[in-house]
Every structure is written in C-alpha cells, then in structure tokens.
Amino acid sequence: MGRKFFVGGNWKCNGTAEEVKKILATLNAADVPSQDVVEVVVSPPYVFLPLVKNELRPDFHVAAQNCWVKKGGAFTGEVSAEMLVNLSIPWVILGHSERRALLGESNEFVGDKVAYALSQGLKVIACVGETLEERESGSTMDVVAAQTKAIADRVKDWTNVVVAYEPVWAIGTGKVASPAQAQEVHAELRKWLAANVSPEVAASTRIIYGGSVNGANCKELGGQPDVDGFLVGGASLKPEFIDIIKAAEVKRNA
C-alpha cells in the first residue's frame, strides 16, 4: 500500500469571516484529484473552525492549529483535545516552529501534546525542522532526530501521525529547500524511523514538506520519492492552493 499524498493548508493567524467564506467558495468549487489520490486538510484559526467545518466540501477535512497538552480545566486561553473531538474536528497541527520559537514549546512538551492528542482520538500533523544556524552548522539531522525522538518516546502507534518537515529558514521567507535538500532530510528521517521505531512505521508514515511551497515549485518537490505531500502556509490562503493539491498527480503518474 503506497502512502497517500497529503496536502495541509495552515492558515495561521489570518482571515476575517468574509475572507474565510471566499476561501471556502474557491475550495468548494475546485476540481481536484479524488480522495483516493490525495488527502486534503485545512487548518483555520480556532474561531473559524465551526464555520469551516460546516461549509467545507465533505472530501476535505479540518485541523486545529494547536491544542492543550492534557485534559481541560483551569488553563485560560487553551483549547483541549476533547473539545476538538466534541466538535468532530479530526486533525490538529502540533509542534509548529512558530510555537516552538515564540512560545518556547520544547521537544518534550510537543511530544507530550502529540501523545495526549492521539490518546483522545485526534490525528496529528507533527512538525519538525531546523533553523538556518543549525543547517549551516551541519546539525540538521541531529535537530530533527531529537524533535522526532521526543515524539517516538511517547507514541507507540503512528497510524494517525503525519510528520511535517519544515525547515524554519524556509517558512514565509520565500527561500525554499531545493527538491534535493528536501528529499535528503525526508530520506534520513525515514531511515531514523526505521532504526528507532520500526521499518513498518518508516514505510507507512507520511513525511510532508513545509516551507514556502507554492504553485511553481510543488510538482518538483512532490515528485521526490520520500516527499509525501505538503504543509502549506501563505499559499493556502490563495487560489494557487488548488494547484498544490493537484501536484498529487505527480505521484499517481510516477
């Protein structure tokens, strides 16, 4: 069984109700490959989750951009995994580099979040990736392996995990990892999973790429053997997101 292509759209902290309705209209009218070719998940800000869930076409799914590390309670401003499950939100993005950098989320904290979200029945897009300094010092794989290990130490069943490799230096900067750079890290990450989790998990877990993915570079990136899709930032708010979804065809035609 091949790994189904996965395209996630991370809207980050963007949008008004009117803008969200426009994006939904574009997505709902789009002619894209069927669900057996590509899995599409969009991740609006919390306040728009019910609107998007109710209005989005049924073959696309919805993700939250974060959730709390344990059961709800006296944690002002947080949203628990149980609340997302209660709203039938199937996916959550955890460990995004912006949260690691701006909010100080450690590898261990992200690992705990992933484990708790999975335990409540959510599917998780778990983000890993290195900074420019780390890449230039040659420590990319050490960093990515440590981030992945913190998840592997806490998670036994990887069925509902998608790993998103997002080189921090390529997020929102217009810089993009070359197809060869992306493939190299994805292949090394898969090798790490094979050695430290299991060959089965390595073969079946989707590793997607994030970092300035757009309509112009998505086909070449998506054609790499270990790139199983994308986590798209800014471009997911634009019509070119449709072109990125269509890049799934490169795998079907390979």
From Swiss-Prot:
Keywords: Cytoplasm, Gluconeogenesis, Glycolysis, Isomerase. The keyword Cytoplasm applies. GO terms for molecular function: triose-phosphate isomerase activity. Its EC number is 5.3.1.1. Substrate binds at N10, K12. Pathway: Carbohydrate biosynthesis; gluconeogenesis; Carbohydrate degradation; glycolysis; D-glyceraldehyde 3-phosphate from glycerone phosphate: step 1/1. The active site is at H96, E166. CDD domains: TIM. InterPro entries: Aldolase_TIM, TIM_sf, TrioseP_Isoase_bac/euk, Triosephosphate_isomerase, Triosephosphate_isomerase_AS. It catalyses: D-glyceraldehyde 3-phosphate = dihydroxyacetone phosphate. It is found in: Cytoplasm. PROSITE patterns: TIM_1, TIM_2. One of its GO terms (cellular component) is cytosol. In plants, there are two types of TPIS, cytosolic and plastid. Belongs to the triosephosphate isomerase family. PANTHER family: TRIOSEPHOSPHATE ISOMERASE, TRIOSEPHOSPHATE ISOMERASE, CYTOSOLIC. This is Triosephosphate isomerase, cytosolic. It comes from Petunia hybrida (Petunia).
